[in-house]
């Protein structure tokens, strides 16, 4: 282990860096407090875990609905396959009978099988209808998750607004950029097109961040 003392110049340099970082941190906190942004940023930071929980909820509800729908399809498909195969077999037998009428006993057997098939059709269709209803009910997650996603969008927009306020209030003057003839930012970044000096669109947000070098 190296026990040699740190050179005085290195120690002084490290102490100076720490002191400057502390001063900058204090200045930033004081500025935020004076601007009234400290509470707003704290609220935005607190919203992040809540947003994560809401996203987890959306993922859970979506997966649950998908699983319910798949289970219904898997339950109904064998019955539909059975109806299809039985109907095809009966059609072949009836076509053969019409092409070459068979003896009465064989015809009676064909009629009996057809009646049995017709008797089970309502059972299968009723079961399938129940599965279709379950699939439809599984889609109710969209109503709930839609509300959650809308709340998430509000949170993200609020965080973005608070961070932009910090940037706009605590940065030096930004050199003006050449404007295109069709540029809508003739009066600088705006957040409300009805109020001067406020950002109105995502393009203007991107323009501000780009001008800051972010």
Curated annotation (Swiss-Prot):
On whether Repeat is a keyword of this UniProt record, the answer is no
Where, per UniProt, does this protein localize? Answer: Cytoplasm
The UniProt entry, under InterPro entries, shows: Chemotax_Pase_CheZ (IPR007439), CheZ_family_phosphatases (IPR050992)
Instruction: Write out the entry's keywords from A to Z.
Output: Chemotaxis, Cytoplasm, Flagellar rotation, Hydrolase, Protein phosphatase
GO biological process terms, semicolon-separated: archaeal or bacterial-type flagellum-dependent cell motility; chemotaxis; regulation of chemotaxis
- Which SUPFAM superfamilies does this UniProt record tie to the protein? Chemotaxis phosphatase CheZ
Q: Which domain of life is it from?
A: Bacteria
Query: Does Cytoplasm appear among the keywords?
Result: yes
The EC number on file is: 3.1.3.-
Q: Which Gene3D superfamilies match?
A: Helix hairpin bin (1.10.287.500), Single helix bin (1.20.5.590)
GO cellular component terms, A-Z: bacterial-type flagellum; cytoplasm
Residue runs in coiled coils: none
Q: Where is this site: Enhances dephosphorylation of CheY-P?
A: 147
User: What's the top EC group for this one?
Assistant: hydrolase
- UniProt GO MF annotations: phosphoprotein phosphatase activity
Subunit comment for this entry? Answer: Homodimer.
The cross-references to NCBIfam families, in alphabetical order and at most eight, read: PRK11166.1
Q: Could you say which protein family the record assigns here?
A: Belongs to the CheZ family.
The role this protein plays is: Plays an important role in bacterial chemotaxis signal transduction pathway by accelerating the dephosphorylation of phosphorylated CheY (CheY-P).
Name the chain's protein. Answer: Protein phosphatase CheZ
- Protein source organism: Yersinia pestis
The lineage is:
Bacteria, Pseudomonadati, Pseudomonadota, Gammaproteobacteria, Enterobacterales
